[in-house]
């Protein structure tokens, strides 16, 4: 199922649902992104950053998401905030059912095994 032609949004959304985590590093800034995508189209992200070893206040974002298939496992992820304002549109690709790459910055997200979300 993973590598056939253009998938339907529902199939991609089913693969996206769950908790994902990515680590980032750019110069003196180290970050950790945790994203939870729910079946009802809602999402929540938490960004933690450390600048030169000093932790910055975490930033949490909530809203709704929509998926537009591009080709096979490649899709565009649209997010809006709780007030309906567009936030971002990023192109992502599923490498497999547990690995997703955000094409901006080539950030690799890995599915978190735990069924417990850190935001509950």
Predicted regions and their residues:
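Contiguous, well-ordered beta-strand patches that form the walls/edges
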Residues: 25-32, 46-107
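Short, low-complexity, Pro/Ser/Thr/Gly-rich segments in the mature regions of secreted, periplasmic
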Residues: 109-119
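Structural motif
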Residues: 38-39, 96
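Short, ordered coil/turn segments that flank beta-strands lining enzyme active or ligand-binding pockets
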Residues: 39, 82, 113
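N-terminal helix-cap/turn-to-beta initiation motif at the start of protein domains
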Residues: 4-21, 34-38, 118-120
């Amino acid at each position: 199922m993973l590598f056939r032609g253009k998938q339907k949004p529902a199939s991609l959304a089913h693969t996206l649902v769950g908790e994902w985590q990515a680590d980032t590093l750019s110069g003196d800034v180290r970050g950790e992104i945790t994203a939870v995508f729910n079946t009802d189209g809602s999402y929540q992200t938490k960004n933690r950053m450390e600048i030169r070893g000093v932790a910055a206040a975490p930033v949490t974002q909530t809203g709704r998401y929509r998926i537009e298939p591009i080709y096979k496992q490649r899709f565009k992820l649209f997010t809006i905030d709780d007030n309906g304002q567009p936030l971002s549109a990023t192109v992502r690709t599923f490498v497999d059912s547990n690995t997703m790459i955000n094409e901006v910055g080539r950030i690799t997200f890995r599915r978190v095994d735990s069924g417990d979300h850190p935001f509950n």
